[in-house]
């Protein structure tokens, strides 16, 4: 099993245990075909490849922000996303390192708190 982290568009998170052949699990987690984006040697973002084409799929603020930091504001990441570690020499996914797991969960928690406070303000 390889640890991964799903971050939903509402900033909630879920730790996933991916099997060795994790393609179907990744597709299920993002709701369709997957696209891998390497953000760092040990951090890969998985998103829905057709996210912008699916009616009703919301932007993922965290995914978009991390994409922008690496590649500039050239794309928007839509829908729920999954983070894994990089890949090994054979191209297989690696587990998400604990340091990334903690940082990403903290970021999602802070944004969820801010989002909920704003929602109450405008309610």
Regions found by a protein language model. Give the residues of each.
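Domain-length accessory/inserted modules outside core catalytic folds
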Residues: 1-123
